[in-house]
């Protein structure tokens, strides 16, 4: 998945002036939704960094709480695909995600540490939000490293999301109308989300130290000393 050849194949399918029907992207399998996730980005005094995403899968996991520890138990096994379940678009489950001994289910989680050519950590970032995690994390990276937004702006900027199945581009309510219009010009079917798209936590190296942002979509605030 990280090879330049695979990236080039995906890039070749992108058209700047239009989107395409689902069949153009040749979706072979679908992945179940997930949720009940939290992310933490940390940088220590010595410059070492941790990007950690944890999950109990769905909201409140298995909805079972240990009477001894009070800890909610997860239902992570539900993240595996079932051989007998096809989604509403008629796309079969992925064999790569079937249950096998010693195997972990596929996940949208992508805790990320960006490192410069000098070997120094430049950005620590990740998100919670089920299938929206990957795009939300990528957008924060793009806004900061490519567009030069400060870390707070990169995290707070209104987001969009499309996971192909369903082929609907979801946008946050406060997104710039020019963005929505440009998407529709390219034949995207847009839909305003009733809530928000993922929750991002990020830390970025600055000339004089570090800057951190915790997504206000979930009432977060960064902490440091």
UniProtKB/Swiss-Prot annotation:
GO biological processes: glutathione catabolic process; leukotriene D4 biosynthetic process
Coiled coil regions, renumbered to chain: none
GO MF annotation: an example: glutathione hydrolase activity
Highest taxon, organism lineage: Eukaryota
Active-site positions on this chain: 37 (nucleophile)
Alphabetical list of Gene3D superfamilies matching this protein: 3.60.20.40
Residues that coordinate or bind L-glutamate: 55, 76, 107-108, 129-130
InterPro entries: GGT_CS, GGT_peptidase, GGT_ssub, Ntn_hydrolases_N
Pfam families in the record: G_glu_transpept
PANTHER family attached to this UniProt entry: GLUTATHIONE HYDROLASE LIGHT CHAIN 1, PUTATIVE GLUTATHIONE HYDROLASE LIGHT CHAIN
General remark: Corresponds to the light chain of other gamma-glutamyltransferase family members. Has no catalytic activity.
Family: Belongs to the gamma-glutamyltransferase family.
Name this protein carries in UniProt: Glutathione hydrolase light chain 1
Organism, as annotated: Homo sapiens (Human)
Gene: GGTLC1
